[in-house]
Amino acid sequence: MSGRGAGGFPLPPLSPGGGAVAAALGAPPPPAGPGMLPGPALRGPGPAGGVGGPGAAAFRPMGPAGPAAQYQRPGMSPGSRMPMAGLQVGPPAGSPFGTAAPLRPGMPPTMMDPFRKRLLVPQAQPPMPAQRRGLKRRKMADKVLPQRIRELVPESQAYMDLLAFERKLDQTIARKRMEIQEAIKKPLTQKRKLRIYISNTFSPSKAEGDTAGTTGTPGGTPAGDKVASWELRVEGKLLDDPSKQKRKFSSFFKSLVIELDKELYGPDNHLVEWHRMPTTQETDGFQVKRPGDLNVKCTLLLMLDHQPPQYKLDPRLARLLGVHTQTRAAIMQALWLYIKHNQLQDGHEREYINCNRYFRQIFSCGRLRFSEIPMKLAGLLQHPDPIVINHVISVDPNDQKKTACYDIDVEVDDPLKAQMSNFLASTTNQQEIASLDVKIHETIESINQLKTQRDFMLSFSTDPQDFIQEWLRSQRRDLKIITDVIGNPEEERRAAFYHQPWAQEAVGRHIFAKVQQRRQELEQVLGIRLT
């Protein structure tokens, strides 16, 4: 006989064997109702030639029956259908599988089974390729071989020893790197000796065409004669400088002032000044040329260029702290040590300083806040004293000692500072280490994959039957997760679960799917289209 399935498409005629399948499942025939096809006792041979025998089972009604007449598989939502594996035909008439639309007009809308509701967790956006590579690197961050591999390959212990040594080495390098970063923030200087050379040359006056030359005075020189003049040179260099790069002499100073005799050169022409500007170009020395044939007393005022800047303390505060000229940070540190040593910090209000008699004389107050100290200290700081050198410019041709040398202390950058900066800025070693880490991670991942394959093959060779059964069970669980058909494993393991009415429909659908599959295969082989 022929009938219709739950989806509204025609079912194939049942053969006597098909009835035997339904009877074997133990499904009793449903009671007759509206829209139900007559049983075998009420019908004869159908037009399709199918014969309904005693073993043939009738299908449930497909007409507009009430909700009570619909059989529902446990664990499936109303209106949902069983997926049929291998069914490649077009969608049957009616609603598609898995939709919430009613199967027939007039049927109530389907609702999801509350036991199968799941929390809809919003999925994150798929990572970009760069982010995906970063996640992969983070997943492979553990370079330790698993214990099972170490037991399988005893030689891998050498790799683990190297890994432990590398971890200690990385910790040591990281600690030293942090120490270098902290040290490079502070001024790293060395005290060196700078030797200053002060020399002068004298050019006597000469008449035109006269090779002998005569000495004259500025007032009595003829108009055509060459005026007598002298030239003063100030140069210098570092003593025992190990660096190959020579530093310019002017780079040590902020300003240089040469004060000549005011009685000889007047109040407007007796000063020669040089001050550092942002656009100043460094030079190896200074030279001054003036007319004159008399000895000149001059004073050189050299202001050192301290980096960071240094300041001279008020004499009262300098005697109290024992600091004469220092940087602002060093002065603040010395001041705090004095406050801490003399217990001047207020015991209750810690942000206040109780001034002793010396502080009251210097800061002119009996109590001040910590935040007020920099402002109070600014009025007590002065520019450091310049280096004063007195020199006599000699114009006597018989005086052989015309060069004077003076040694002064200067601060220069520690050569280690440049090396530390280059070490921190260098990325060559880091790139090489990163590339080697990637290779190690890839090797460890390959070893883990090979170990998994070995376990797979070893389990199969040990007990093929149990292995295949366990593998099928695992694949079955994965298939349920992929197809979103979870069901109830506890019910499915019992025989009564398969004696329910929905099993008849499942068998019919399976047979129909197989028939359609065979039909397509036959059409492909014969190259015809059966109608």
From Swiss-Prot:
The entry's keywords: Chromatin regulator, Isopeptide bond, Methylation, Nucleus, Phosphoprotein, Transcription, Transcription regulation, Ubl conjugation
Annotated PROSITE patterns: SWIB_MDM2 (PS51925)
Modified residues annotated as Asymmetric dimethylarginine in this record: R81, R104
Region (Disordered): 205-227
Annotated compartments: Nucleus
Maturation and modification: Ubiquitinated through a signaling process involving RAC1 and the RING finger protein UNKL.
SMART domains in UniProt: SWIB
Residue ranges of domain SWIB/MDM2 in the record: 306-383
Keyword Ligase appears in the UniProt entry: no
Major subcellular location class: nucleus
Record cross-link Glycyl lysine isopeptide (Lys-Gly) (interchain with G-Cter in SUMO2), residues: K226
Modification sites for Phosphoserine: S203
Short name of any one Pfam family annotated for the protein: SWIB
Gene Ontology molecular function terms on file: transcription coregulator activity
Record PTM Phosphothreonine, positions in chain: T217
Similarity-based family: Belongs to the SMARCD family.
Quaternary organization: Component of the multiprotein chromatin-remodeling complexes SWI/SNF: SWI/SNF-A (BAF), SWI/SNF-B (PBAF) and related complexes. The canonical complex contains a catalytic subunit (either SMARCA4/BRG1/BAF190A or SMARCA2/BRM/BAF190B), and at least SMARCE1, ACTL6A/BAF53, SMARCC1/BAF155, SMARCC2/BAF170, and SMARCB1/SNF5/BAF47. Other subunits specific to each of the complexes may also be present permitting several possible combinations developmentally and tissue specific.
PANTHER family (UniProt xref): SWI/SNF-RELATED MATRIX-ASSOCIATED ACTIN-DEPENDENT REGULATOR OF CHROMATIN SUBFAMILY D
Protein known as: SWI/SNF-related matrix-associated actin-dependent regulator of chromatin subfamily D member 2
Species, as recorded: Bos taurus (Bovine)
